[in-house]
Design a protein with these regions (language model features):
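Extended, non-catalytic structural segments that build the interaction scaffolds
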Residues: 20-24, 38-46, 59-87, 287-299, ...
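Short amphipathic alpha-helical segments
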Residues: 122, 126, 135-147, 299-307, ...
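Short, charge-rich, low-complexity alpha-helical interaction segments
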Residues: 307, 393-400
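Long, highly charged low-complexity segments enriched in Glu/Asp and Lys/Arg with interspersed Ser/Thr
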Residues: 404, 436-447
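Intrinsically disordered, low-structural-confidence terminal and linker regions
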Residues: 1-62
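A generic structural-conservation signal
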Residues: 143, 361, 438-439
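Extended, charged amphipathic alpha-helical segments
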Residues: 5-8, 12-15, 222-368, 402-425
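Structured, mid-chain assembly/scaffold modules that mediate subunit interfaces
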Residues: 71, 77-247
C-alpha cells in the first residue's frame, strides 16, 4: 500500500460543534437506513402473506450472497444493517465488541532523550498540550460510534473536525469510500467518490473544508478526479478485518443464517403467545326437555341475542364469543410454550457459541472463576486485537497535527471487565526496582 503524504491545512468554515449539531438534525436524511430497508425488501418473500411474519424471509437471497461474498459485499453490508435493527441478539453482539475498548485506559508518555536529558519546561508543555487535546476530544462517545459501525460493516470511514468547541467525527457513506493505503503510524487512509456530492451540494457548501476543495477538484475533471484523497488531518478509518484492505465484509456474516432462523423462531413464539391467551366463550340458549319438540327454547332468542350483544361488548380483544343452541365448552388455543422457549434459548446460545467470541453473553455455559477470567480475556483479545492498535496509531497521528511536540499515547490492553485487575497488577509491579520495572514495562507494552 502506498504511504500517504499529502496534507491540507485548510480550516473548516464551521466549528466541530456546529457540524455535530447539523449532522444530528439531518442524520435521517443522509443516513443509510433506506438501504437497510431495501435489504429487508429483498429478504421478504412477496408470494407469502405479510401477516405471517415468521415465514417472510427468503433465505435464497442470503445463500446467493454467501456464494460469492466479495462480489456481494454491499448487499451483505445492507443485510448486516437490517439485522442490527431487527435482532436484539445481533445488536448485543455488536455492542459487546464495540465497548471492549476503554478509551480512558491510556498512558500519555512525554518523549525524553535519556542521553541528553530533557528540558523540563518543554516536557511539561508537551505533556499538558497533549492532555488538553485528548480531554477535548470526547473519545469515549465519538470512537464508540465508529467501533459500532466497524463491527457491523467491517470498515468505518469518517471526517474528523476539531477546534476549541470540541471534536466530532462525521460518518462517510461506505458505498462512496474505499481504503487506499496506510500511514506510517499504521492506521488506514481512504479515498472518497466525490460524485456522491453532486446530489448533496448543500452539504458541501454548509460544511466547507475539506469538502469544498475536494469537490472543486472533482468538478475540474469529473472522470480523472472522481476519487479524492481524504486529507490527513480529517481522515479517520477503522477496519476490523485488517488482513484484507480491499474487501469490506461484515465480521459476523457467517452468523446471518442463524440470526434469520432465530428471528423466525421469535416470530413464531409471538404468534404462539397470542394464541395461548385467546379464548372462545359460548353462550348456550337452553332447550326444553320435551323430546317431541323442535327448537323449543326456554329463553326467547331475541331476548338472548339482546343480552349476548351486551356481553360481547364487554369482552377484551383476545376473547371471542358465540351464541348457539349446541352445548360447547370454553375453547383455548394453548401450545407447548416451554418447548418453544427452549428452542429460542438454544438458538440464541448457538449464535453466541459460534460467533468466535462474546462468551460472556452466554455466561450460563461458563462455570467457575478461572473459566470466567479465561473467557473474558479471550473475548477482550478478540474484540481489541485489530481496532486497539489502529486507535493508538490514529491518535498519535492526529496529535501530531494539533500539538507541536506531542507526547506519545499508549492504549492499554484492557477492557471494562479487566480494568480492576490491571490496576492491581500495576500497583504490585510498581514496588520492584528499576531493572525489573523496565522489564515489566516492556511486558506491559511500554518502552
Amino acid at each position: 500500500m502506498a504511504q500517504i503524504k499529502s496534507k491540507v491545512s485548510s480550516t473548516p468554515t464551521r466549528t466541530a460543534a456546529e457540524i455535530k449539531e447539523w449532522y444530528e438534525k439531518n442524520e435521517k436524511n443522509i443516513s443509510n437506513f433506506a438501504k437497510a430497508q431495501n435489504a429487508l425488501k429483498q429478504l421478504v418473500d412477496p408470494t407469502k402473506s405479510t401477516t405471517r411474519t415468521y415465514s417472510t424471509f427468503d433465505k435464497t437471497k442470503l445463500r446467493t450472497y454467501m456464494k460469492n461474498p466479495p462480489a456481494q459485499y454491499k448487499n451483505l453490508r445492507n443485510l448486516s444493517r437490517y439485522l442490527y435493527y431487527r435482532s436484539s441478539v445481533y445488536r448485543r453482539l455488536i455492542w459487546f465488541n464495540a465497548t471492549m475498548i476503554d478509551t480512558n485506559a491510556r498512558a500519555v508518555i512525554p518523549i525524553i532523550d535519556i542521553n541528553k536529558g530533557g528540558d523540563k519546561a518543554k516536557v511539561l508543555k508537551s505533556y499538558y498540550d497533549t492532555l488538553s487535546v485528548l480531554n477535548n476530544m470526547n473519545l469515549a462517545l465519538e470512537f464508540l460510534k465508529a467501533y459500532i459501525i466497524a463491527w457491523r460493516e467491517d470498515v468505518f470511514f469518517g471526517m474528523a473536525f476539531y477546534d476549541d468547541t470540541g471534536y466530532f467525527i462525521l460518518p462517510v457513506d461506505p458505498d462512496y469510500a474505499k481504503v487506499n493505503g496506510a500511514y506510517m503510524t499504521g492506521d488506514l487512509s481512504y479515498v472518497m467518490d466525490m460524485s456522491y456530492y453532486t446530489r448533496h451540494e448543500d452539504m458541501v457548501e454548509w460544511i466547507g473544508e475539506p469538502l469544498t476543495s475536494m469537490y472543486r477538484q472533482y468538478q475540474s475533471n469529473t472522470t480523472e478526479n472522481r476519487w479524492q484523497q481524504m486529507p490527513d488531518e480529517y481522515c479517520v478509518c477503522f477496519k476490523v478485518n485488517i488482513d484484507d484492505y480491499e474487501i469490506p465484509l461484515p465480521p459476523y456474516m457467517n452468523l446471518f443464517n442463524s440470526l434469520i432462523n432465530l428471528a423466525d423462531l421469535e416470530d413464531i413464539q409471538a404468534v404462539a403467545d397470542e394464541a395461548n391467551i385467546y379464548k372462545l366463550v359460548t353462550a348456550t340458549i337452553p332447550l326444553s326437555n320435551d323430546q317431541d319438540g323442535v327448537d323449543q327454547f326456554l329463553v326467547d332468542p331475541d331476548t338472548a341475542i339482546e343480552y349476548y350483544n351486551k356481553f360481547v361488548d364487554s369482552l377484551p380483544d383476545y376473547i371471542a364469543a358465540a351464541i348457539t343452541p349446541i352445548p360447547l365448552d370454553v375453547l383455548t388455543f394453548g401450545d407447548d410454550q416451554a418447548t418453544d422457549v427452549n428452542k429460542i434459548e438454544n438458538a440464541t446460545k448457538t449464535v453466541f457459541n459460534t460467533s468466535g467470541g462474546a462468551q460472556l453473553l452466554n455466561s450460563s455455559s461458563i462455570s467457575g472463576t478461572t473459566a470466567w477470567q479465561g473467557a473474558i480475556k479471550f473475548d477482550e483479545k478478540y474484540a481489541t486485537s485489530s481496532l486497539l492498535p489502529q486507535t493508538q496509531a490514529y491518535l498519535n497521528r492526529f496529535l501530531s497535527y494539533q500539538v507541536s511536540n506531542p507526547a506519545k499515547v499508549k492504549m492499554l490492553e484492557t477492557s471494562p471487565y479487566t480494568k480492576s485487575t490491571l490496576k492491581k497488577e500495576l500497583l504490585e509491579e510498581a514496588q520492584y526496582g528499576i531493572p525489573n520495572a523496565l522489564v515489566i514495562n516492556n511486558l506491559n507494552g511500554f518502552n
